[in-house]
């Protein structure tokens, strides 16, 4: 017999908030789209977690479960005894996907981490000592508890919202999220973008989750600064993305926009009539030796050798003619 308290990993006296936290953690962990390599077990665990949450999050269902177990929910508890149960004709569990979507208010839970910056200020979370976090009085879950659940036919949704510093501490400037696909379809993909001003600089974080792989791009004032895949920095992917965006080199300045050279002062021309024009100066100015070229040097040595041999032959002829005259 499955124990719903054990499924969620909570005590029998757990508070409703503890049950919500446990469901959130396990539902994200065992969602089939996050476990493509172990989908059968993930679907089974995902269904159990949804059933446990559906029972323990409802006060009446939880009370009957505590007294009579799962049989009480099916209308059979008490060995034929007469007890007042609203589920005497049997309780039917909902589709786990519907429970999941209703819990998260129709928003994409994979687009960002509810406990990570830059969203913790927006949701009222505060960072505690040693990096731990405690939730504020305004729970994220209660904020979206009034949203209706999506029908089972809906497998994709996209949503976004924008704030202008009026919520939290004013650090979050904008956020948008889009999702494609859904459970049972595979090819799940979500894209979220957040923008936050930090010390006068615009920090943009783009998070892409597709079939269990998370890619995070962080830019500063329009320049891509870092790229991680599943939490690990990828320099090759960063260089490729920067090249694709044309961020490797500074834009060249068009020739037509270069400032013209300032004309020479007239007074300087009057007192220095002997000054040469720039063209004349270039012609008369001695040329600085250029960089050494091995091919040119070899050609020069060869030519020099020819001249030396020719000079030696001419001197030899002169000596012979001189001896003949004597």
UniProtKB/Swiss-Prot annotation:
PROSITE patterns in the cross-refs: DNAJ_1 (PS00636), DNAJ_2 (PS50076)
Query: PANTHER family of this UniProt entry?
Result: DNAJ HOMOLOG SUBFAMILY B MEMBER 2, SIMILAR TO DNAJ HOMOLOG SUBFAMILY B MEMBER 6 (HEAT SHOCK PROTEIN J2) (HSJ-2) (MRJ) (MDJ4)
The keyword Cell membrane is annotated on this UniProt entry = no
In the record, Phosphoserine modifications are located at 277
Principal subcellular localization: cytoplasm
**Protein name (record):** DnaJ homolog subfamily B member 6
A cellular component term (GO) from this record?
Z disc
Among its keywords, does the record have Thylakoid? no
Region (Interaction with HSP70) location: 2-146
Q: What does this protein do?
A: Has a stimulatory effect on the ATPase activity of HSP70 in a dose-dependent and time-dependent manner and hence acts as a co-chaperone of HSP70. Plays an indispensable role in the organization of KRT8/KRT18 filaments. Acts as an endogenous molecular chaperone for neuronal proteins including huntingtin. Suppresses aggregation and toxicity of polyglutamine-containing, aggregation-prone proteins. Also reduces cellular toxicity and caspase-3 activity.
Cysteine-cysteine disulfides: none
- Give the SUPFAM superfamilies listed for this entry: Chaperone J-domain
All copies of the J domain together span: 2-69
Stretches for region Interaction with KRT18: 119-242
User: Which locations, inside or outside the cell, does it occupy?
Assistant: Cytoplasm, Perinuclear region; Nucleus; Cytoplasm, Myofibril, Sarcomere, Z line
Q: Where is this region: Disordered?
A: 249-326
A molecular function (GO) held by this record is: unfolded protein binding
Residues bearing PTM Omega-N-methylarginine? 135
User: What's an example Gene Ontology biological process for this entry?
Assistant: chaperone-mediated protein folding
Alphabetized, the UniProt keywords read: Chaperone, Cytoplasm, Methylation, Nucleus, Phosphoprotein
Q: Where is the signal peptide?
A: none
Quaternary structure and interacting proteins, as annotated:
Homooligomer. Interacts with BAG3, HSPB8 and STUB1. Interacts with ALKBH1. Interacts with HSP70, KRT18 and PTTG.
Fetch the InterPro entries from UniProt.
Answer: DnaJ_domain, DnaJ_domain_CS, DNJB2/6-like, J_dom_sf
